[in-house]
Amino acid sequence: MPVTMSQAFLDNFLGNSPKWFKFAILSFLVINPVVFYLNPFVAGWLLVLEFIFTLAMALKCYPLQPGGLLAIEAVIIGMTSPSQVLHEIEANLEVLLLLIFMVAGIYFMKQLLLFAFTKMITKVRSKIAVSIMCCVASAFLSAFLDALTVIAVIIAVAVGFYSIYHKVASGKNFNDSHDHTSDGQSQLCEEELEAFRGFLRNLLMHAGVGTALGGVCTMVGEPQNLIIAAQANWQFAEFALRMSPVTVPVFVAGVLTCFLVEKFRVFDYGKQLPDAVHKILSDYSAHEDAHRTKHDKIKLIIQALVGVWLIIGLAFHLASVGLIGLSVIILTTAFNGVTNEHQLGKAFEEALPFTALLAVFFAIVGVIIDQQLFAPVIQWALSYEGNTQLVIFYIAIGLLSMVSDNVFVGTVYINEVKAALLDGQITRDQFDLLAVAINTGTNLPSVATPNGQAAFLFLLTSAIAPLIRLSYGRMVWMALPYTIVLSIVGILAIQFGALEQMTQYFYDNNMLLHHTLQEVGNSAASAH
């Protein structure tokens, strides 16, 4: 039977995606202009939910195409403007540069990363110990580096482990070329492969939550932390001290949660590394040690030295994150002899689709701004006073951070609170407490979904996610115990006065100084 033009169009539209998904996206494109004409506010929230839907279906169809179509239509019908989208991209240029250059830079350091993590996995047999090490190490690194950088490191290691096992289990040698994305080989043991996938899922999720636990603690941990610190005129040590009444108990609770979910094997955790896989990784480590030449050793030394530069450069903000990433690419490739354009190109394959997706996401953020979707929530939160106001802000921001980028939510709220301070609605001391509530509210509950944390979204849309069967729904389910514990511990720390009492204690002991209204008035305006 000949194919009609309409059938051919539908077959080509969004490629191999399920037909129901194609019809859903086409329905959204038809419905949105009508709803926007009737009620722009409702249309704005509808668009946000539709975009979340495209993210949830990431394993069926990469979100760039369906999400991009929705964003293009939103601009065309006037929900936002091209200039607003460009403004959002300009404001987040550092994040885009980070994705383009830093992730590629990590690619050229993966020999060293694989060397270090293979030793850890093969020497430490306790899954609970490995999980806690992953969580704590990610938290420590994220306190000084960007969470996306840390996740890029963990992803590079996970892909390395997976490809080694897949290659050997498919009957090939360590040095043979192999496509680890294909499961067609008859030698693969499905049960063993599934167990290994589960093991890698566990480690990646523990590491992902670790980035949130560490990222909330310091002003360099997350992009919104820098914006909040600038508005409040806080320096590195003061920021960490002001956050500590909330972040310290939350960190302890997070590590305890890591232990408990592994111990009792709930929420898809507790997956053990199969003995056969452990043997393959141990054999790989021994093989690499035995066949490591002086050229290989020099490469590892160069990568280690560049790693030291990476940590120092980021911790002391010697340059923007993206530029440090570019320097990592140049240094590792120059001194390790990677000069072929094709070899260089491979490093950029992982991050560029996500970079494009993030640009589309900024178009959705433009709609949120232009349609003032968060305005009612902000006004409602400001109607309360004192400690109750802190709790309401934390909850409201936490809920919004679950569905929208936490950088955007944090920026909008700190600007609104600053405006309230300058209008005389709140005192300067209350502003400082609200800044803590805003920072913790954007960083902690946002682990609930990949929408809130860019690092989680990057993990969901990375090459490793389909290999280890990490879907949107599974990420939400595995993050659930952390979401509940971190959110509740954060609320309790504020609700029962720990934040106010400890802050007062810091004032009384001259560990903190009271700021003035003028300091906020003169602080640098945020990028938004």
UniProtKB/Swiss-Prot annotation:
Catalysed reactions listed for this entry: 2 Na(+)(in) + 3 H(+)(out) = 2 Na(+)(out) + 3 H(+)(in)
Annotated transmembrane regions: 23-45, 66-86, 95-115, 139-159, 203-223, 241-261, 310-330, 349-369, 390-410, 448-468, 476-496
Family the entry assigns: Belongs to the NhaB Na(+)/H(+) (TC 2.A.34) antiporter family.
PANTHER family reported for this sequence: NA(+)_H(+) ANTIPORTER NHAB, TRANSPORTER ARSB-RELATED
Role description: Na(+)/H(+) antiporter that extrudes sodium in exchange for external protons.
Protein name: Na(+)/H(+) antiporter NhaB
HAMAP family, sorted: NhaB (MF_01599)
Bilayer topology: Multi-pass membrane protein
GO molecular function, one term: sodium:proton antiporter activity
Pfam family, one: NhaB
Subcellular location, record wording: Cell inner membrane
Primary location: membrane
UniProt organism field: Shewanella piezotolerans (strain WP3 / JCM 13877)
Annotated keywords: Antiport, Cell inner membrane, Cell membrane, Ion transport, Membrane, Sodium, Sodium transport, Transmembrane, Transmembrane helix, Transport
Lineage summary: Bacteria, Pseudomonadati, Pseudomonadota, Gammaproteobacteria, Alteromonadales
Domain of life: Bacteria
Keyword Acetylation: no
